[in-house]
Amino acid sequence: MKASNETKQKVISDLIKTAAGRAKLAASMVQPLRFRRDYTSIGRKTFLVEALPDGALPIYDKDPKATAYVVGEEGENILAIQKPKRVIFPLFEIASNPEIPLTQVKERRFDLIERAQDLAKSEIQAEEDGRVFEIMDAIAGAATDDGITNPDIPVVAPITPSVLADSYADIERHDLRVAKVFANAKDYSDIRKWGRDVLDIETQQTLLKTGLLAYLWGAQILVSRRVPVNHLYTCCEAEMFGRIPVRTELTVLSADDPKARTIGFSIFENIGIGAHNPAGLSRLVVAR
């Protein structure tokens, strides 16, 4: 739970009164030299996230007309489930176990313990997004022009508005609304060159940190390093595309090792990922 502004002000006031407190306050304000910003998950934006009650199983009734794609039980492979009336989205863990030598904690001018946790959480979110785009690739790779799924749209760079409009049309012909477009920064550079006449560019820093860079014809364009280069994914609304059942949300457990004099943490989440509507996805494959 986050502290209120009044509580924060009181803590700061108490720390300022002593030399040790001022040193601690100064250390908390120092930031390490970073290679890049911490990763923020964007894959969940195109799935309906559901917290599972204790004892509940991630079982869903499925339209027999559509094939469901799920991440396997160990999170290793993608399964295609076609005929059953019900489908279970297997749960799997994504974990990170940072370890910090106790001697390093005092040597750093920043909060090393908090930074280690932030990095671990960031990498877990990046790994989760990797599984999301693997599912999208599985759907697109099995797609045919059968009126239910949408075959890939080949594109010779640069990407043009007319090509992306065709991708929108593939989804909208199924009475679905396009809500998200996922791109790598290398491919988004083509879209950025369209200018403000086509693109409604977001400039707020808080939005940029979440991966949201622009709106196009009512849909959000989200950019991430986890999106494969030379691929763009156009997706329908979350409730019509898939589910992410969550048994255990991102959790931090203490895993210290006194004999090795290390401070450790076990950071993990237990989730499932499944897409039940292949018609809600269209993939552009770009040749450069």
Q: What is each residue range found by the language model?
A:
Residues F89-I100, S282:
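A short glycine/small-residue-enriched secondary-structure motif
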Residues K2-E6, K10-S13, W194-R288:
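Sequence/fold signature of self-assembling virion shell proteins
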Residues E99-R173, V286-A287:
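Alpha-helical scaffold segments that mediate packing/assembly in large oligomeric complexes
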Residues K24-I94:
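Assembly/oligomerization interface modules of large self-assembling protein complexes
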Residues A140-L212:
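Extended, solvent-exposed, turn-rich assembly/linker loops in the middle of proteins
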Residues E93-N97, V178, T262:
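Broad gene-expression machinery/nucleic-acid interaction feature
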Residues M1-R36:
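N-terminal alpha-helical "arm" segments
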Residues E99-P101, V181-D187, C235-E237, N277:
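Helix N-cap / beta->alpha transition motif
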